[in-house]
Amino acid sequence: MKVGIIGAGTMGAGIAQAFAQTEGFTVALCDINNEFAANGKNKIAKGFEKRIAKGKMEQAEADAILGRITTGTKEICADCDLIIEAAIENMEIKKQTFKELDDICKPEAIFATNTSSLSITEIGAGLKRPMIGMHFFNPAPVMKLVEIIAGLNTPTDIVDKIKKVSEDIGKVPVQVEEAPGFVVNKILIPMINEAIGIYAEGIASVEGIDTAMKLGANHPIGPLALGDLIGLDVCLAIMDVLYHETGDSKYRAHTLLRKMVRGKQLGQKTGKGFYDYTK
């Protein structure tokens, strides 16, 4: 099966790796230009270099995986069997991307979006084929869960096919109903937002909050470190979707979160968030 990944950022590159490291899959990793797409593949290669240096991976295995990934713009997705969009969490960008792909891809290609919170039905509205949600978690090559979300017009056979594909690459698919944030992010992101509020109120330090949740709630990573890993811009986007879709004030993003995003302190991806990653 040939899989087209649209968006070669953190999630797109991770999803590409998850497929390419499984025999039987080839990947077309795409972005708005060739350089961005190549950067995504290079990110995967650099991760492999670290694993090889630690003796956790053989060079031949890395070469085989990278050999299954081609890069370019969306035009190289014309013959793909499955398209997974992993672009920025913006409804209009996603809709426009799929509108263009609808004319490029073969009729039998399945369209899936990796959106973490947006409406599957709305993303797929007006397309010549159905849409399905296939939500991976960061880091995509490692995290086992894939949330499978059917839109209003998603046929059962498409749902079954995507579940099978998820299992084929070693993931555990969980079907959830279409709702803002689905399951994981509807629980997780407000928790991170609450942790930001606790820090802003001076109740505990960043390290104190994360240590408390790791030792007191048995979380493998603290909420503020997790926010940095996810990307504070992504956290804000999800909070805004939850708030606008539900109108419930409990989903209102904390002002500190918004301020940090405006200041480009997004976490690991920019080198600084609640922790400093430049040291």
Describe the role of every protein-language-model region.
Residues I110-E177, F182-N185:
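Rossmann-fold dinucleotide-binding core
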Residues F25, P139-I149, P220-I221, D240:
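Acidic/polar active-site rim loop that often engages polyanionic ligands
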Residues M1-K50, K54:
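NAD(P)+-binding Rossmann beta1-loop-alpha1 motif at the extreme N-terminus of oxidoreductases
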Residues A28, T70-G72, I84, I132, ...:
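Hydrophobic/aromatic beta-strand patches that form the interior of the parallel beta-sheet core
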Residues F36, K50-I110, L118:
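Rossmann-like NAD(P)-binding element
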Residues E23-G24, T156, E167-E178, A200-E201, ...:
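NAD(P)-dependent Rossmann-like dehydrogenase/reductase catalytic/cofactor-binding core
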Residues G12-I15, K94, S116-I120:
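Short glycine/serine/threonine-rich phosphate/pyrophosphate-binding segments
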